[in-house]
Regions:
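Active-site proximal loop and beta-alpha junction motif in alpha/beta enzyme cores
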Residues: 2-86, 92-306
Length: 306
C-alpha cells in the first residue's frame, strides 16, 4: 500500500507573491523586495514565515487594509527575522505592484495615496506615463540628526584606515523614518575596500536600539553620492543594495551640514559594489519632510501554497 500523502486539491491559503527590483529600471539590478498584494487575514507569525521563506530578499512588504481612518492602505514590512517600521525599497515596490495590478490607475499624472505605517501615515505617490507606472515617491519624516557617540570606532568597523575618512564632513547619525550612521569617505574607491565587522555596528550608538545600520559614502560629483549600507546582525541583513530610508536620512544629514545640491535634489547611488547598482532621488518637500523617488521592475509573480 502506498502511504505517501498527495497534495490536497484544496488549500487554506493562496498567497500571491511578487518579486520586484526597486530603485532601478534594469532587471536584476537595484534592491529586490517581496510584495504580498493582499496581506489581510495573515497573522504576524505567517507574515514572518513568508518573509523567511523568501530568504534571499531583505524585506517583504504586505499590503493590507488600514485601521487608521486617515489612511487608504497599510504597509507592513518584515525581514527574515523581525518586523521593521519602514522600508523604502519595499514601499516603492508596493506602489509599482499596485499600479501593475490596476489598483492605482493614471494616464500622465501622479496618483497620491495615504498609507499607514508603523511610523505614522505617510503620503506616497505613483507617477504614470501613458498609463504605466513610471516613478514612485515616498514622503518620509522631518529629518533629525544626532552625534554618533562611537564615531571613533567607524574606521575599524569598516576595516578602513582613518585616512579614508573625509575631512569635509564628520561621522554622524540622521533619521527620516529610521536611524542610520553616516560615515563620509574621501573618495568612491574606498567603498570597494570595506570589510565590515557587523557585530560592532551598534558600538556607534550603544544607547539607541533603533540604529538600523552604518552608511559609508563618498561624493561622485556635487549632486551625486555613492554609498553602501550594512546592518547589525539582529536585522538578518548583512548589506542592503539600495536603502530608501537611509537615502532619505542621508539627505537630512547633508542638509544639516550644507552638503545638499543647490537645486535641492540629491542622486544617491548604492549597491554597485554588490553588482546590484541603483539610485534614489532625494529631496525635501514643502512640508519639510524628506522625500525619495525611485523606479522599479517586476521580476516574477507566483503563488505560495501553504
Amino acid at each position: 500500500m502506498n502511504t505517501t500523502s498527495k497534495p490536497s486539491a484544496q488549500r487554506n491559503h493562496h498567497v500571491e507573491v511578487w518579486r520586484v527590483n526597486a530603485f532601478t529600471d534594469v532587471p536584476f539590478k537595484g534592491n529586490p523586495a517581496g510584495v504580498v498584494a493582499d496581506g489581510d487575514g495573515l497573522s504576524e507569525e505567517a507574515m514572518l514565515a513568508i518573509a523567511g521563506e523568501l530568504n534571499d530578499i531583505s524585506e517583504t512588504v504586505f499590503i493590507c487594509q488600514p485601521d487608521d481612518p486617515g489612511a487608504e492602505l497599510r504597509l507592513r514590512y518584515f525581514t527574515t527575522t523581525m518586523e521593521v517600521d519602514l522600508c523604502g525599497h519595499a514601499t516603492v515596490s508596493a506602489l509599482f505592484t499596485l499600479g501593475w495590478l490596476g489598483r492605482l490607475r493614471g494616464d500622465n499624472e501622479t496618483r497620491t495615496v495615504r498609507v499607514q505605517t508603523n511610523v505614522g501615515v505617510l503620503e506616497l505617490g505613483l507617477q504614470f506615463a501613458a498609463g504605466e507606472p513610471a516613478w514612485a515617491s515616498m514622503q518620509q519624516l522631518p529629518p533629525q540628526t544626532a552625534p554618533a557617540p562611537g564615531a571613533e570606532h567607524a574606521p575599524a568597523i569598516l576595516g578602513l584606515p582613518e585616512s579614508a575618512l573625509s575631512t569635509r564632513f564628520d561621522t554622524g547619525c540622521a533619521y527620516a523614518g529610521l536611524w542610520a550612521c553616516f560615515v563620509p569617505l574621501e573618495d568612491v574607491s574606498w567603498l570597494r575596500r570595506i570589510r565590515v565587522d557587523s557585530d560592532r555596528i551598534e558600538e556607534l550608538w550603544p544607547d539607541n536600539p533603533e540604529l538600523s545600520g552604518i552608511y559609508p559614502f563618498a561624493f561622485v560629483d556635487e549632486t551625486t553620492t555613492q554609498g553602501r549600507f550594512f546592518s547589525p546582525p539582529k536585522y538578518g541583513i548583512v548589506e542592503d543594495p539600495v536603502t530608501g530610508t537611509a537615502c532619505g536620512a542621508l539627505g537630512g544629514y547633508l542638509l544639516s551640514r550644507g552638503g545638499m545640491p543647490g537645486d535641492g535634489e540629491l542622486v544617491a547611488r548604492q549597491g554597485f559594489e554588490m553588482g546590484r547598482g541603483g539610485l534614489a532621488r532625494v529631496s525635501r518637500n514643502a512640508n519639510g519632510n524628506m522625500q525619495i523617488r525611485g523606479q522599479a521592475v517586476p521580476i516574477f509573480r507566483g503563488e505560495l501554497l501553504a
